[in-house]
Amino acid sequence: MAPNLRKSHPLLKMVNNSLIDLPTPPNISAWWNFGSLLGICLVTQILTGLLLAMHYTADTSLAFSSVAHTCRNVQYGWLIRNLHANGASLFFICIYLHIGRGFYYGSYLYKETWNTGVILLLTLMATAFVGYVLPWGQMSFWGATVITNLFSAFPYIGQTLVEWAWGGFSVDNPTLTRFFALHFLLPFMIAGLTLIHLTFLHESGSNNPLGIVSNCDKIPFHPYFSLKDFLGFALMLFLLTALALFTPTLLGDPENFTPANPLVTPPHIKPEWYFLFAYAILRSIPNKLGGVLALAASVLVLLLVPFLHKSKQRTMTFRPLSQTLFWILVSNLFILTWIGSQPVEDPFITIGQLASITYFTIILILFPIISSLENKILNY
């Protein structure tokens, strides 16, 4: 009998083991779709980004008008730009849901997979930040100024660090040029890290909603889950297209329709919606260095989650107390997102500080305590 090329060819064999004959738990729910959706987001962003880069000029005097030119004069340029801008939002929606799934179902116990995932999140955030600066609108410029200025909070080397990042004494042409270079490079770094992430995942196999070993029950990925993934792709691309065609500017900032002007500060500087929770945590601390450390901690706290797992059960499926706490944490993140979009005045300052304290308290203190309590209740 002739050898099956899919199983014998050195390249096809790898594809086969990752996408076709991959043993998969039979009971994984739609929450396990977001990994592949993130893959589609990445491919979409790289393709639309490449097409945009062909018409973009990374120069302070031309950047804004080159984006306007793309939207007005390039064939379907408006569509490519809208897909790229809204694709970023969908990318973050998917990654936040993906992280939430991992948190709820204890997937973080695959430590290597989880840690590479956190590095991927940080890289994605960096990519989105430098990308937001490129259209060179008011919010692009002032967002870049405010966030890069945070490096000056580092003792002794701070100011040197900021000027080194800027390439001068303010956000100017060198800054824009290097941000464009980084925005072009980082997505390929994300693609490489994704392969490492998947390599670690396929070492252990997928987790499942029950959090139990399912080796004896596993089924091939194709056709069962490839079809399920395809449905996810269709739904997400439908949502992206609807967003790009009907309300392309819904998630953007109106300030960015004005070209960057270093002499006029916008009344309220704020990042895109997907960074608002971290921005609220940054602003809730009156000290500059403290704020920067809290901002870093808001994401890096994810690295501690595997070490704070005290429950004898892996997932939260049968742990109602932890479930309640999880949804309180989700609500708290929504509150932080809302606070980040509000001006710095009285009720919002206090609410932001309370929500920031709650965020860290839930993750670092309450989850381990509640998990231990549940162990006791269940006589473990």
From Swiss-Prot:
It is a multi-pass membrane protein. Heme b b566 binds at residues 98, 197. The chain crosses the membrane at residues 34-54, 78-99, 114-134, 179-199, 227-247, 289-309, 321-341, 348-368. InterPro entries: Cyt_b/b6_C, Cyt_b/b6_C_sf, Cyt_b/b6_N, Cytb/b6-like_sf, Cytochrome_b, Cytochrome_b_C_euk/bac, Cytochrome_b_N_euk/bac, Di-haem_cyt_TM. Its cofactor is heme b. Pfam families: Cytochrom_B_C (PF00032), Cytochrome_B (PF00033). Heme b b562 binds at residues 84, 183. Gene3D superfamilies: Cytochrome Bc1 Complex, Chain C (1.20.810.10). The keyword Membrane applies. GO terms for cellular component: mitochondrial inner membrane; respiratory chain complex III. Binds 2 heme b groups non-covalently. PANTHER family: CYTOCHROME B. Component of the ubiquinol-cytochrome c reductase complex (complex III or cytochrome b-c1 complex) that is part of the mitochondrial respiratory chain. The b-c1 complex mediates electron transfer from ubiquinol to cytochrome c. Contributes to the generation of a proton gradient across the mitochondrial membrane that is then used for ATP synthesis. Heme 1 (or BL or b562) is low-potential and absorbs at about 562 nm, and heme 2 (or BH or b566) is high-potential and absorbs at about 566 nm. This is Cytochrome b. It comes from Coracias caudatus. The gene is MT-CYB.
